[in-house]
């Protein structure tokens, strides 16, 4: 697809594993990315920061990194800052975009100030009176609701709450994962979609139809009964406009090069953006490979395209 000489990349580290709650997903993503790059002739090597110090990257002559870490320090700006310090080019967003992209609370604040539509929400802090906050939130937002830790990915500890009685326990569970919990009004009627972003590639939207209540961790990485609709079924003009808004949602956070923007449609077709992902999963269940495959781009071609974005000034 790209016609890039793989020798231009030099010695490439595929970063995967790490120590976040998403370690197992990252291990799967990283192994596939590693194989995809090697299939294209790239001099790629595995590197798990949970097992080796990052300083080894410089010591061992790596000049480039494909970041397949998910969550935690791999996605919150820390790895990005360290790679900047060592002068190693890397895939995905820089420090600011990565940090904001993993923080759903501050993402939503930026979107509110820049005109990107996002569901109404409330925040709960660890240590708050959960019963009192639950009563207040239901009065403001109604039901159903989604409860989310502010800084976990892969839908870790995300719960859908349909009754007021269930909300305090959901808040307590989410607060074990993060000191800030987001409670978001559930957008109903139009379905869930994702826009995959990879440089200048024009990738189709994907409509996600999980067998269960919503697109949770199990539906993302375990179940085989989630439906991924490509084409997504929307009129071409609407799809193009939604992709434009998705790119804006990505850009205003300082995110660059590649990732995902997830959103819901209500019954009237209005979009509400949920989150971005600056280091998307690359497993066989993951969305970017599916979107690429739908337009004739193989897994290996996709990872080379993503890596090629590190060649840009």
UniProtKB/Swiss-Prot annotation:
- State the source organism's domain of life: Bacteria
The record lists the catalysed reaction(s) as:
2 D-alanine + ATP = D-alanyl-D-alanine + ADP + phosphate + H(+)
One of the GO biological process terms: peptidoglycan biosynthetic process
Query: InterPro entries, per this entry?
Result: ATP-grasp, ATP_grasp_subdomain_1, D-Ala_lig_Van_CS, D_ala_D_ala, Dala_Dala_lig_C, Dala_Dala_lig_N, PreATP-grasp_dom_sf
PROSITE patterns assigned: ATP_GRASP, DALA_DALA_LIGASE_1, DALA_DALA_LIGASE_2
Which amino acids does the record list as binding Mg(2+) 1?
Answer: 262, 275
Cofactor list: Mg(2+); Mn(2+)
Tell me which residues bind Mg(2+) 2. Answer: 275, 277
Under Enzyme Commission nomenclature, its number is 6.3.2.4
Q: What GO molecular function terms would the record report?
A: ATP binding; D-alanine-D-alanine ligase activity; metal ion binding
GO CC: one term?
cytosol
All copies of the ATP-grasp domain together span 108-308
Instruction: Tell me the Pfam families matching this sequence.
Output: Dala_Dala_lig_C, Dala_Dala_lig_N
What keywords tag this UniProt record?
ATP-binding, Cell shape, Cell wall biogenesis/degradation, Cytoplasm, Ligase, Magnesium, Manganese, Metal-binding, Nucleotide-binding, Peptidoglycan synthesis
Cite the binding residues for ATP. Answer: 138-193
Q: What is this protein called?
A: D-alanine--D-alanine ligase
Originating species: Burkholderia cenocepacia (strain ATCC BAA-245 / DSM 16553 / LMG 16656 / NCTC 13227 / J2315 / CF5610) (Burkholderia cepacia (strain J2315))
